[in-house]
Amino acid sequence: MRLDDITTNIRLRNAWEAIDLGFAMVQYYWKAVYPAWTLLLFSFAFTLWFLTPDDYKTYVFFVLWWLKPLYDRILLFIFSQQLFNQPLSTADVVSALPRLITKTGLFQALTFRRFSLSRGLNLPIWQLEQLRGKARRERQKLLHLQAHSQAVWLTIACSHFEYIFLFSLYLLIILIDPTDKLWEILKSPFDEFADEPVKYWGEFIYTFTYLLIYWIVEPLYMAGSFSLYLNRRTQLEAWDIELAFRSLADRLRGISYHTFTGLVALSVGVSIFYTQ
């Protein structure tokens, strides 16, 4: 990891400013984030939908929701590569999937750690630092001293945003549909007496409307969590001071070079003057 390659302004921030920086990172890196994110998320979702028997379509939403830790690993990989100015294509993201699945603690994240509210802050320890066991626990405890509560609230806020957006879209549909036919389709997943064709489309709309909202919100969540992690690293390891000293050293080298050149020119000029 080369601090000189970082593409964002590293300085000490409070936790909420760090989260705001993460949101700005999504806007700045969107060309690198969304092509791969869109391809992987929606191709997996559509494959799962069409392979699932009609009687079990209701569970597609649950499976997609449960696999959030997998998607977070993809997003963190993209953000970490972009942060350090590493060239990245969609093919690079796809080729990294086997390692992201097997080398980042995904099994734990999908089982007994699934409901951790600080999973976004903890993920870089697993994925980027590759720490395990006692070293991971000590590192996590240290990072949590000043960022844990903000990481938890970020998780809660993003989860609420997803459902607020979902219910807002449903409410909008109800308001603009004078026939109530769309409403009948939308509520069919929760009606055991609904006709099968109606229920099929109701489940499809519900699942992929939520997926669209998740497609928007989750990069914000992961970038905010990653920025929290970076801010704690900056606090603990004084990245901002190190970068400031490096910048100062670069400027001094430039000044020294120009000063030396000026002295040489002056010396040559004086020598020529006296020889004449």
For the regions a language model picked out, list residue spans one by one.
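Hydrophobic alpha-helical membrane segments
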Residues: M1-Q276
